[in-house]
């Protein structure tokens, strides 16, 4: 089969997420301590998760559901019962600064993206989160020269697996489902969304247990560089 475009998820597909998230939360906690909040790390994590749960519940299915500034804002509100804009900004900025500083592409990602482009394929990043943050990540990772299109869920108002997250980048690149590959680490977002529209789906960096009860991807790979063996 001849492909014309490859769509990649960003977070935990092109770089490892857990280490970045941990660095961000640690920095936010340290900032909270400097601001006078009497939180142990465990207490901070509990407050952060409480704020996160509320945001996820209220904003499910939107890009803002992932916004750490909202998590920090809500955590402070729940803890203090008051509005503290400067503190919420400080914690959110500390989180993202440390997160981005920790980011590093998985081995072989740049070489793989370059090989795909050299073979004439369009490369897109299709990601669930707000645009400013994802632009910051793209810049920090040096991906612009290797990616033809970035689409965030903030741009569509819907999150993967919503069809618009796949149909819009296909329309912009002038390709159809049978010509397009979706590569990601999420069965529910990347694989299910791609499968529903007839894209070829590739699951990477994911545990086998994630597939239980779900339709299978067309291919499974352990790392992004293996993609060239599948597609080229």
Residue ranges and their predicted role:
Residues 33-46, 79-92, 146:
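Short, surface-exposed acidic
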Residues 1-6, 18-19, 110, 114-117, ...:
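Asp-based, Mg2+/Mn2+-dependent phosphohydrolase catalytic module
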Residues 86, 97-123, 226:
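Short, acidic loop-to-helix structural element flanking the phosphoryl-transfer center
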Residues 54-94:
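A metal-dependent, Asp-based hydrolase signature
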Residues 66, 103-107, 159-160:
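Conserved phosphate-coordination/catalytic loops
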Residues 1-8, 13-47:
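Active-site neighborhood of HAD-like aspartate-dependent phosphohydrolases
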Residues 21-29, 47-52, 72, 92-99, ...:
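Hydrophobic alpha-helical core bundles mediating ligand binding, dimerization, or RNAP-core interactions
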Residues 36-66:
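Alpha-helical substrate-recognition element adjacent to the catalytic core
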